[in-house]
């Protein structure tokens, strides 16, 4: 869903949920060019998501798209700082929000938002465990362990997680 679509995007959310059983939507602020907390740019679509009771997942942190390319292919990383989702979590306290990926280079900001807001969860996929910062591991094994999500096709046991960390 393009958050810039406003009312048309909100109608699309409702249609997809009601007619096709869609249970959530992924947003990629860097690729879609928006700040998640920009009320004018995307709150109409987010309001529809909240009303329909669906999960929202936001790409956070660096993206591989454009990495190393001239001008980063126009991708602006600033849009994917997880701190922008703090406002979204306040404004939509009943809407589940997932921070996709460890949010590098803003990992600690993502951890703070997930710890502070009960409706915010952290997805650990898309980043090799060997690059997880120690703070991320500490939070994942303690105060956020019930809010950490793993990509289903890459479920890691403790042993395989340790093995990947050592690689």
Predicted regions span which residues?
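Acidic (Asp/Glu)-rich catalytic clusters
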Residues: 11-21, 44-52, 87-92, 111-117, ...
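Active-site gating loops and adjacent loop-to-helix segments of metal-dependent hydrolytic enzymes
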Residues: 63-78, 117-119, 164-167
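Generic recognition of short, well-ordered alpha-helical segments
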Residues: 8-11, 37-40, 83, 109-112, ...
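H/E-rich (His + Asp/Glu) clusters that bind or coordinate divalent metals
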Residues: 96-98, 102-167
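Active-site gating/metal-coordination segments in enzymes
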Residues: 1-67, 76
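Conserved short-loop catalytic and cofactor-binding motifs
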Residues: 1, 30-33, 72-73, 98, ...
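A conditional alpha-helix N-cap/helix-loop micro-motif detector
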Residues: 5-6, 35-39, 78-81, 103, ...
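Aromatic-anchored, glycine/proline-accented short structural segments
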Residues: 68-101, 109-110
């Amino acid at each position: 869903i393009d958050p810039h679509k406003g009312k048309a995007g909100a109608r699309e959310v409702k249609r997809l949920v009601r007619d096709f059983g869609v249970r959530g939507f992924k947003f990629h602020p860097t690729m879609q060019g928006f700040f998640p907390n920009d009320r004018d740019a995307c709150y109409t679509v987010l309001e529809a998501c909240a009303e329909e009771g669906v999960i929202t997942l936001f790409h956070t942190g660096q993206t591989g798209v454009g990495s190393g390319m001239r001008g980063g292919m126009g991708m602006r990383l600033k849009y994917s700082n997880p701190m922008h989702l703090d406002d979204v979590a306040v404004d939509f306290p009943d809407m589940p929000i997932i921070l996709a990926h460890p949010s590098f280079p803003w990992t600690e900001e993502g951890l703070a938002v997930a710890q502070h807001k009960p409706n915010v969860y952290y997805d650990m996929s898309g980043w090799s465990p060997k690059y997880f910062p120690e703070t991320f591991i500490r939070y994942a094994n303690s105060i956020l362990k019930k809010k950490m999500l793993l990509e289903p096709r890459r479920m890691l046991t403790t042993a395989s997680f340790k093995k990947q960390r050592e690689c």
